Amino acid sequence: MHIPVLLKETIELLNPQPNQHFVDGTLGEGGHSLAILERTSPDGKVLGIDLNEETLKIANTKIQSSNFKTDKLTTDRLILAQGNFSNIKGITRTNEFITIHGILLDLGLSSRIL
């Protein structure tokens, strides 16, 4: 899996705790979301948003097939939404993602897109 630049620093600043919920507004290949899911076990959730449908599929496959050390990762912990983070309010409402402990936007360019 692609490891995002400044992953450690980003996770330290977000400081995800067990059972918290986060929005990853620029899911990409899911590296940040995977790290958040690891730290929010057992019942924390991530709403991952990406404009590119193919990227959502890649992230979902990588996260679901990862072997990180947690007691469970089911589809109810990772919620995927195709869209632009500029519509975050509508996307969170549509997905009934009400309680949010943090929001991540990685605004760099993906080497896959270049």
Regions from the PLM with identified roles:
Residues 100-101, 108-114:
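S-adenosylmethionine
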Residues 24, 45-50:
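Conserved SAM-binding motif I beta-strand of class I
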Residues 3-20, 35:
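Conserved alpha-helix/loop element of class I SAM-dependent methyltransferases that forms part
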Residues 29-43:
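Conserved SAM-binding loop of SAM-dependent methyltransferases across substrates and taxa
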Residues 8, 52, 82-88:
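Conserved SAM/SAH-binding loop
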Residues 59-60:
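Conserved SAM-binding loop
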Residues 68-87:
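Conserved SAM-binding strand-loop segment of SAM-dependent methyltransferases
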Residues 17-20, 86-105:
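A short acidic, Gly/Pro-enriched loop at the edge of an enzyme's catalytic core
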